[in-house]
């Protein structure tokens, strides 16, 4: 059942031009595994009819047609098959933008394929930090010393940029439903018959996906999920990341930005050319810190951004442009004026003379 969940996601990603790297392991079948069926769990046929050849065609009719599964060495009772080395090397060499585990797990480990907190210090995926979807049991138990989630986050310049994981024992079928909800938030076309009707434009925001998936498991009635297991799942999964974290789902590109090199406070507008669909923000210093002035959507042509307030000369106008799968653009613009002005650096009040002195 773990495989049918994970491979339905891999199949979708392949259908949109991604190239997911799979490390799939047969789990504890004691040599009796058959590659002719996905699962013996109740209602497997409903899931297969939806994701398989008769439905969305993300997976074949049998796992044998897919292939690529690692098998344990039953004779020597070796279930690891050097899993931790395989997983570690994959993360180090090509971590991708999402690292997903769908299997059994516990406080400091993934079970099959095996990987644990003790392997995290050996990760060297510098400056290429994936977001981790750890969909299992208890791998996000932050009250337990050295849980896997904290290990992946705390290691310097390696591991993951954030993790979604549960804090204790979970229900497997509800986990599947939850994970499908996460991916339907990331990619709105993943489940065309289910999920949110709000267009997300494929913004990969894990903390928002976590919340959306919890609504998803209550809205949809996937097989073998129940009211109590939905509540359990909703309570246990947490997003260990910044609330507004956005992921790159492609190698990020530079944006071509053109704009005025200076800003005169008398103008009340600023000219800029930014890619269509980008978000343009302008801000400046204020007594309480940085203050947002205006936000606009880029058109791909030169456009004028209204600056609603008078800005003090010698301050800076900050221009920020963001767009999905593009590197953030930031520029500081000097604020000028053609008029005379007075700048107050500090002041002193003499209580004895009742004088206020400005410098």
Which residue ranges define each predicted feature?
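A eukaryote-biased signal for short, well-structured alpha-helical docking elements
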Residues: 235, 339-342
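Cysteine-dependent hydrolase recognition
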Residues: 1-335
């Amino acid at each position: 059942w773990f495989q049918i969940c994970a491979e339905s996601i891999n199949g979708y990603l392949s259908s949109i031009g991604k190239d997911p790297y799979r490390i799939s392991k047969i789990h504890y079948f004691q040599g009796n595994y058959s590659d002719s069926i996905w699962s013996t769990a109740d209602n497997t046929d409903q899931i297969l009819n939806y994701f398989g050849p008769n439905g969305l065609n993300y997976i074949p009719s049998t796992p044998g047609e897919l292939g690529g599964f690692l098998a344990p060495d039953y004779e020597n009772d070796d279930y690891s098959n050097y899993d931790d080395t395989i997983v570690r090397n994959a993360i180090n060499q090509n971590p991708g933008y999402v690292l997903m585990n769908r299997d059994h797990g516990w406080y400091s480990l993934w079970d099959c394929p095996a990987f644990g907190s003790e392997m995290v210090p050996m990760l060297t995926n510098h400056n290429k930090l994936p977001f981790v979807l750890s969909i299992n049991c208890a791998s996000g138990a932050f009250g337990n010393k050295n849980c896997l989630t904290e290990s992946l986050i705390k290691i310097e310049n390696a591991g993951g940029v954030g993790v979604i994981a549960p804090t204790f024992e979970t229900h497997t079928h509800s986990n599947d439903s939850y994970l499908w909800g996460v991916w339907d938030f990331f990619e709105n076309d993943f489940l065309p018959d289910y999920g949110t009707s709000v267009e997300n434009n494929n913004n990969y925001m894990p903390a928002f996906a976590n919340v959306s998936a919890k609504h998803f498991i209550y809205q949809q009635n996937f097989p073998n999920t129940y009211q109590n297991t939905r509540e359990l799942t909703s309570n246990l999964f947490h997003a260990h990341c910044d609330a507004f974290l956005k992921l790159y789902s492609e190698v990020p590109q530079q944006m071509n930005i053109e704009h005025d090199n200076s800003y005169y406070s008398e103008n009340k507008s600023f000219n800029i050319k930014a890619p269509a669909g980008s978000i343009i923000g302008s801000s400046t210093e204020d007594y309480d810190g940085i203050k947002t002035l205006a936000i606009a959507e880029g058109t791909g042509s030169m456009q004028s951004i209204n600056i609603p307030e008078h800005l003090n000369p010698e301050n800076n106008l900050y221009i920020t442009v963001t767009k999905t799968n593009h590197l953030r653009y930031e520029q500081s613009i000097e604020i000028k004026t053609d008029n005379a002005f007075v700048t107050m650096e500090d002041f002193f009040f003499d209580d004895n003379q009742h004088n206020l002195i400005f410098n």
